[in-house]
Amino acid sequence: YTGTTSSAASDVYKRQILFYARLAAPLSLLFAVIYFGTNWITSRRTDNHQLYLEWELAIPFVPSMIYMYASLLVLLLLPAFTLTRSQLIALARSLVAALFIAAAIYLLLPADLGFVRPDHVPGYNAVFQALFALEMPHNLVPSLHVATSALFIAVLYRSLSSVWIRAGLILWGVLLCASVLLVHQHHVLDVVSGLLLGYLCYRLVYRRAIERT
């Protein structure tokens, strides 16, 4: 029976991962089209705004925080192992809402990054050059990096009951928010507005979708 039970559990996980992958594929395509499309548009505009304060430019550049910044990719995988299908669908809807709201704000309020991007980052150059190639510094307010982090952490926090895991999720979220500042990808307003967007999509889209199921 143990072998049969293990095999059945393995099949359930496989089906769950495949289901998540089928959700993630079109979402990733939609993200690429919307995010890079709006960035392309705003990079060609001349009415971009300075949405930061001068003191923020004194925030230190900490290259090693790029690992924490990139840990969002790990966070994105966790729902496949912890959420039900109805929860995954609700999460996908929440992400779409966050993406379109952010895109509308990017077009209405295009911004310029105040930090000067370095030409060379010793020890991390390849990683940062790849990041700079993907992200033109105009889709700033709100930070989708932060909004996505906040949304996923809120959803996982709700679904997992362990006090230690919940505490770890909160710490992870704090470090993710700090990382976008310390690798000079965003400013303070971007982080605050990203947190607000993530929370609103969690409360108004995810929670309502779950309550209807």
Regions found by a protein language model. Give the residues of each.
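Hydrophobic, lipid-facing residues on alpha-helical transmembrane segments of integral membrane proteins
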Residues: R22-G37, A92, V96, F100-A104, ...
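Residues within membrane-spanning alpha-helices of integral membrane proteins
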Residues: A8, I66, L73-L76, V96, ...
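Single conserved hydrophobic/aromatic residue that forms the stacking wall/gate
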Residues: Y1-Y13
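Aromatic-anchored segments of alpha-helical transmembrane domains
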Residues: A32-V33, L99-L108, L171-V183
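Membrane-interface loops
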Residues: N39-E54, F81-I165
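Alpha-helical transmembrane segments of integral membrane proteins
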Residues: F19-L27, M68, I89-A97, I165-L169, ...
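Membrane-embedded catalytic cores of phosphoryl/pyrophosphoryl-handling enzymes
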Residues: F128-T213
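N-terminal transmembrane-helix/juxtamembrane module of multi-pass inner/ER membrane proteins
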Residues: S10, K14-V74, A111, P118-F128, ...
